[in-house]
Design a protein with these regions (language model features):
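Conserved acetyl-CoA-binding loop-helix of GNAT-fold acetyltransferases
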Residues: 102-116, 246-251, 255-272, 290-295
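C-terminal "cap" of GNAT-fold acetyltransferases
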Residues: 149-169, 173, 178, 281-287, ...
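Acyl-donor-binding surface of acyltransferase catalytic domains
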Residues: 1-11, 83-91, 97-168, 307
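Phosphate-binding active sites in nucleotide-utilizing proteins
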Residues: 190-236, 251
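Conserved donor-binding loop and adjoining core beta-sheet/short helix segment
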Residues: 21, 26, 31-117, 122, ...
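Glycine-rich acetyl-CoA-binding "A-motif" of GNAT/NAT acetyltransferases
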Residues: 73-77, 144, 215, 226-229, ...
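Hydrophobic beta-strand residues of extracellular immunoglobulin-like
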Residues: 65-68, 217-220, 264
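Short amphipathic alpha-helix that is part of the acyltransferase structural core
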Residues: 2-54, 162-197
Length: 311
């Protein structure tokens, strides 16, 4: 959710809701997102949202809607609404072209999202900008989640050798061979986190098709041939950032130091790629995880905020 909170009448403005987009519409939205990211210094739509956007042709994705705001036929705003969680309200992200902010387009998109979601809505504000906070207030949304992006320097990194629990060995992910086992452990490790824990084979395939995917940075921990944990890293080549993309430990194996050991393996790998900085995302209310990362040397870089309608 970005700035743009002034409600003014724009006669030529319209909002179209689509379950699937044409290649031309997809390209126009991607260009809008790129320009917004260039001006704002960050993405307005998450990686998951951008993947769903790029795969929005054909019949689209079940539970995913795309809202296109045009003025005089020109695309000036975009929102994505995902209604796939059986419990939580539909989740949305939105953006207005930097050259068209200040004309009520953000509020128009927000109002359309409320209508499309049956007034049960969660909205991300990446970076937590003040204009986004104000728009959330105007729409009657309240803050309920804070997601921290934390970073640490990798230059000169001197981490102790990882110490794994007895019987645990580490190897890298083999696409096509380890898919089912990884999906099962990921679902178990993130049962409390529907966004991550609900990943499907299609979601995994989409990520493996991304240019950044490299199984050499996807580490699996096994005991007696069974997967018990993993650390999937990601390299942001353009920004020269290494990410602790997903780190998970199977329930029942937690508490033995496996998570810390896997973190060390991944950070060492990222440092060996010559990347100067590592990053990760963690919920602010996960005090234990935040404390672990702070002890490793991570500090908060920025915070994404999620707002929702009152339940």
């Amino acid at each position: 959710m970005t700035s743009d909170d002034i409600a003014r009448s724009v006669p030529s403005r319209s909002v179209e809701t689509c379950s699937a987009l044409t290649p031309e519409q997809t390209e126009a939205v991607l260009e809008l997102l790129a320009e917004a990211a260039r001006i704002d210094g960050q993405q307005a739509v998450s990686e998951q949202g951008r993947i769903q956007l790029r795969h929005s042709g054909g019949g689209g994705r079940e539970g995913v809607s795309h809202l296109l705001l045009t003025v005089g036929g020109e695309l000036v705003g975009y929102a994505q609404l995902e209604d796939t969680d059986p419990v939580e309200a539909p989740a949305a992200e939105l953006v207005v072209h930097p050259s068209h902010r200040g004309h009520g387009h953000g509020r128009a998109l927000g109002t359309a999202l409320l209508a499309a979601s049956g007034k049960r809505l969660r909205v991300w504000a990446h970076g937590g900008h003040s204009a986004a906070r104000h728009l959330a207030q105007v729409l009657g949304l309240t803050l309920f989640r804070e997601l921290r992006q934390m970073r640490m320097p990798l230059t000169g990194l001197d981490l102790p050798d990882p110490v794994f629990p007895a019987g645990v060995t580490v190897r890298t992910f083999v696409p096509g061979q380890d898919d089912a086992a990884w999906l099962a452990v990921n679902a178990a490790a993130f049962a409390h986190h529907p966004e991550q824990g609900s990943l499907t084979q299609r979601d995994l395939d989409d990520r493996m098709a991304e240019p950044w995917f490299d199984p050499a940075g996807f580490f699996l921990a096994e005991r007696e041939g069974e997967l018990v944990g993993f650390h999937w890293t990601k390299v942001h080549a353009e920004e020269r950032l290494g990410e602790v993309y997903v780190l998970g430990v199977r329930p029942g194996v937690q508490g033995g130091g496996l998570g810390k050991a896997l973190t060390t393996v991944g950070l060492r790998y990222l440092a060996a790629q010559g990347l100067p900085t590592a990053m990760l995302y963690v919920d602010a209310d996960n005090k234990a995880a935040v404390s672990v990362y702070e002890r490793l040397g991570f500090t908060t870089y920025e915070t994404d905020l999620m707002y929702r309608t009152e339940t």
